[in-house]
């Protein structure tokens, strides 16, 4: 379940721990959540400046740690929707010692796609809108860890 919502494992098969708005008030959890919020917001500000998005304001709404084991995947989707109007999406790659589990962006109105190279300590930021449909291919070996976040 995700926030009381049943997850269809045919669409999304991944272990998840939500960090923001968490009930666990342990010092370690609060510390890591605060550090991630600080770093992600720092990179969002750089992204906004690099793309000259004047008067653009948003803040991290949700942070999740994801664990994809063998067979774990996420079918093609966009992060923005009517229930959660996300503006920017972020993914932080933790490790690379797994096979499969590729982050792929599909270019709309074409058959082309962009496969993001696996690199630990890499942060990818993109607009959450319909122009950036993406998926995670099934993991075939090892375990894929990542941290994802969204800004509203």
Give the ranges of each region predicted by the language model.
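Eukaryotic intrinsically disordered and solvent-exposed regulatory patches
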Residues: 51, 77-78, 132-134
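Catalytic core of Fe(II)/2-oxoglutarate
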Residues: 71, 82, 86, 97-152
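Short hydrophobic/aromatic beta-strand micro-patches
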Residues: 93
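Acidic, glycine-rich loop-and-strand cores that form catalytic or ligand-binding grooves
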Residues: 54-69
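Conserved short histidine dyad/triad with adjacent acidic residue
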Residues: 65-83
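Non-heme Fe(II)/2-oxoglutarate
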Residues: 1-56
């Amino acid at each position: 379940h995700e926030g009381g919502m049943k997850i269809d494992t045919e669409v999304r098969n991944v272990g998840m721990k939500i960090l923001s708005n968490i009930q666990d008030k342990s010092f370690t959890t609060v510390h890591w959540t605060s550090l991630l919020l600080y770093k992600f917001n720092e990179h969002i500000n750089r992204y906004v400046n690099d793309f000259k998005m004047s008067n653009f304001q948003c803040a991290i709404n949700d942070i999740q740690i994801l664990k994809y084991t063998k067979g774990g995947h996420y079918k093609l989707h966009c992060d923005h929707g009517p229930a959660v109007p996300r503006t920017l999406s972020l993914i932080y790659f933790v490790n690379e010692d797994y096979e499969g589990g590729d982050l792929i962006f599909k270019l709309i109105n074409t058959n082309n796609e962009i496969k993001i190279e696996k690199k630990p300590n890499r942060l990818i930021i993109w607009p959450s809108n319909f122009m950036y449909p993406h998926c995670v291919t099934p993991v075939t070996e090892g375990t894929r860890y990542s941290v994802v976040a969204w800004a509203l």
